[in-house]
Amino acid sequence: MDGIVQNMFTFIVIVEIIIGWIGNGFIALVNCIHWYKRRKISALNQILTALAFSRIYLLLTVFTVIAVSTLYTHVLVTRRVVKLINFHLLFSNHFSMWLAACLGLYYFLKIAHFPNSIFVYLKMRINQVVSGTLLMSLGLLFLNTLLINSYIDTKIDDYREHLLYDFTSNNTASFYRVILVINNCIFTSIPFTLSQSTFLLLIFSLWRHYKKMQQHAQRCRDVLADAHIRVLQTMVTYVLLCAIFFLSLSMQILRSELLKNILYVRFCEIVAAVFPSGHSCVLICRDTNLRGTFLSVLSWLKQRFTSWIPNINCRSSCIF
């Protein structure tokens, strides 16, 4: 019975990864085609494209780890392999989180309005602020990598230069993974906090705008209010998906003794994979250009499919 549930959980994770590949690949492809045709790309599309590539990279890394852990349940892992796996996971997850936070920061500076000299100064330099935020995050990535590598060196020395990579082993499941998750929670909470802050400030900006409209007896919504609402709808889904991702990390920390159970690990992976896969679908639905291109592709596929079926029926009737 456990084998059936494990296979079902693994199948669900793989489906989520495939959906994430398709969604993020579509975003990257559409933006790259527009970039090639127009010979220029906007700052927003730059962030979306970089975010899509980072999540493709993240999902590919997760898929590789799942495939290896499923096919080879007992693998002797050297110090270099452990560091390599963790570097790819940390690197891809770092840029996935920080680029998403930079996207929220870009929306906030572009849409929100505050009569403050500092805010106006930042608003006039959106590209520099976003680029600077991403560059400063590299320091956190370096620190996170340094801490993880120091921990790996210490533990591998304790286990005589090797670790038995077995999810049923207490050495790796309940100890090694927990420290990794704790570090990820600490460093991942920073971009998540930034996203929450920009989300709350957008709500406050919308509230101030509505209050100002009421004072001037303007009852109909204007363009600025509509822009606030559209961005807030996108930010709400992002915050919820990111909260689900943090839930999966918290589950692994609070119930660390269950990490030796492969079913529990797979369930946490299912919850965590919702964020990079689901957010790409949300971005496609909320972005006008991406949504229009996606609907055009669906219409083209529908036409191809409807023209393909009569040809099959004609060939089958000729055979019989």
UniProtKB/Swiss-Prot annotation:
Glycan-modified residues: 170
The UniProt record lists the keyword Transmembrane: yes
Pfam families, A to Z: TAS2R
Compartment(s) where it occurs, according to its Swiss-Prot or TrEMBL record: Membrane
Protein name as it appears in the record: Taste receptor type 2 member 129
Function field: Putative taste receptor which may play a role in the perception of bitterness.
Cytoplasmic-side segments: 30-55, 110-128, 207-233, 286-320
Family: Belongs to the G-protein coupled receptor T2R family.
Keywords tagged on the record: G-protein coupled receptor, Glycoprotein, Membrane, Receptor, Sensory transduction, Taste, Transducer, Transmembrane, Transmembrane helix
Molecular function terms, GO-annotated: bitter taste receptor activity; G protein-coupled receptor activity
Annotated SUPFAM superfamilies: Family A G protein-coupled receptor-like
Additional free-text comment from the UniProt record: Several bitter taste receptors are expressed in a single taste receptor cell.
Regions annotated as coiled coil: none
Residue spans, topological domain Extracellular: 1-8, 77-88, 150-185, 255-264
Topology relative to the membrane: Multi-pass membrane protein
Cellular component per GO, a single term: membrane
Transmembrane feature ranges: 9-29, 56-76, 89-109, 129-149, 186-206, 234-254, 265-285
Annotated PANTHER family: TASTE RECEPTOR TYPE 2 (PTHR11394), TASTE RECEPTOR TYPE 2 MEMBER 129 (PTHR11394:SF34)
Organism annotation: Mus musculus (Mouse)
